[in-house]
Design a protein with these regions (language model features):
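Phosphate/pyrophosphate-binding catalytic cores of soluble transferases and nucleic-acid-acting enzymes
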Residues: 1-299
């Protein structure tokens, strides 16, 4: 998944080493708990060398968990997921939503019947742990009371076993990581500029062979369109094009629209993000401003 994710090329990676790239296959599940463990491990390695980790991306939920912690959510269970998917295929996702509503009405009110990924995860959490997502999130307050020393002690125990299941050994959930964070957003100053950038980026992807990239997955028996990786913006539309459900023009248009919608959701997150420094992409002094903010930050 190189083109559709805009992964940096080898020349750039050599100049600016990145971590947590190419760590799983598209058919594998990846949870918030796994990211927490992987990110913490890499951040420890970087700070041990006297360097400052730079976290870059667009998954706001992951950023929030790194900084604020999370209730102890169980790792993905493929057997449970398959059972839920089988029920959904037989009875429909509205039936799955009704099941969730019976055990966790709060989560059901937030998750639409048309959102299979989140529905599946919410029901999976309950079947694996015996607790609802709402119950686990309510336990968040007990996590916040942990000290930095406790975090290191518990994570050292976890780090002896790189399996993600080891996270369950941290009693009460995942505490926020023991770092001081400086948060930046870098975005175009107006919506028109943003939309132009999105359209240009999608066309660059197509010109660079994005359809051929998706076709490789389309032809693999172990890759399905309902998998998280293939539901990503761009990949979903390209898959539907290869499936004959969309024309090329429809695929391009829907891919651009879906990307705009994703950007809108990200900007909505950012509007309520605490202690955020907002910078503009067209500011020629943006790097100097960011460096000054970091240098003046109180750690």
């Amino acid at each position: 998944m190189d083109i559709g994710t805009a992964k940096p090329d080898q020349a750039f990676l050599k100049k600016a080493p990145h971590r947590l790239i190419d760590i799983i296959e598209p058919f594998e599940s990846y949870s918030v708990a796994q990211f927490y463990a992987d990110a913490y491990r890499e951040m420890l390695a970087i700070t041990a060398k006297g360097r400052i980790p730079l976290l870059v991306g667009g998954t706001m939920m992951y950023y929030r968990i790194i900084q604020q912690g999370i209730a102890n959510l169980p790792s993905a269970d493929e057997h449970v997921r398959k059972d839920i998917a089988r029920d959904a295929e037989q009875y429909g996702w509205a039936y799955i939503h009704a099941q969730l509503e019976k055990i966790d009405p709060d989560s059901a009110s937030r998750i639409k019947p048309t959102d299979p990924q989140r529905l599946q995860r919410a029901l999976e959490v309950y079947r694996v742990s015996g607790k609802t997502m709402t119950q686990l999130w309510q336990e968040q307050q007990s996590v916040a009371g942990k000290t930095t020393d406790n975090v290191y002690t518990e994570y050292q125990a976890l780090n002896q076993n790189t399996q993600v299941d080891g996270i369950k050994e941290i009693a009460g959930g995942l505490p926020h990581l023991p770092y001081s964070f400086v948060n930046f957003s870098i975005a175009p100053p107006d919506r028109k500029d943003l939309h132009q950038r999105i359209e240009k980026r999608f066309d660059i992807m197509l010109n660079n062979g994005f359809i051929d990239e998706v076709r490789k997955f389309y032809l693999q028996e172990n890759i399905r369109p309902d998998m998280t990786a293939m539901r990503c913006v761009g990949y979903r539309q390209a898959w539907e094009f290869l499936d004959g459900k969309l024309s090329y023009e429809e695929m391009r248009e829907r891919g651009i629209i879906a990307t705009r919608q994703l950007a809108k959701r990200q900007l909505t997150w950012l509007r309520s993000w605490p202690n955020l420094y907002q910078l503009e992409t067209n500011d020629t002094k943006v790097l100097a401003k960011a460096l000054k903010i970091v240098e003046n930050a109180a750690y």
